[in-house]
Amino acid sequence: VCLDSISEIAEVVLSTEKARTKDPRQAYGALADQMADLIRAFRDLPGRNVYMSCKLERMKDEVSGAVLYGPSLPGQRLAQQIAYWFDEVFALRVEKDPDGLPTRWLQTASDTQFNCKDRSGALEMFEPPSLADIAAKIRKPPLTSAA
């Protein structure tokens, strides 16, 4: 199951909620609640692998001045919470190879710019962008040492 993209879904929910309330600030609380329910409902579908994409937003850390990248979602609460709801959070990275051609990778662990994670422990920091290969790698039983 694929939801592409939860950023767009959140924007539609927020627009609907703003039209329903007199004070647009209340719409953000309703947005966070509805998106949490929707994301968890899809995430927890029995017997299904669920993939959700999200726009990427460039942010500047006011304390350190560092440039950070994270999910682009309306409302601070939703953007801050979303990564906690998933076992796997990847960033699609595009870098140039030695010949200057673009190469795509999925980053699976955090660094100074991207907040990523891999709870499976089965992935390298950068993986080729094949979700089928990544799913197979995660499902592969761990090697056990003979005693």
Model-derived regions, located:
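P-loop NTPase motor core
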Residues: L3-Q80
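P-loop NTPase motor domains
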Residues: V1-C2, E8-V13, R119, S130, ...
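Conserved GTP-binding G-domain of TRAFAC-class P-loop NTPases and closely related GTPase folds
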Residues: R58-A147
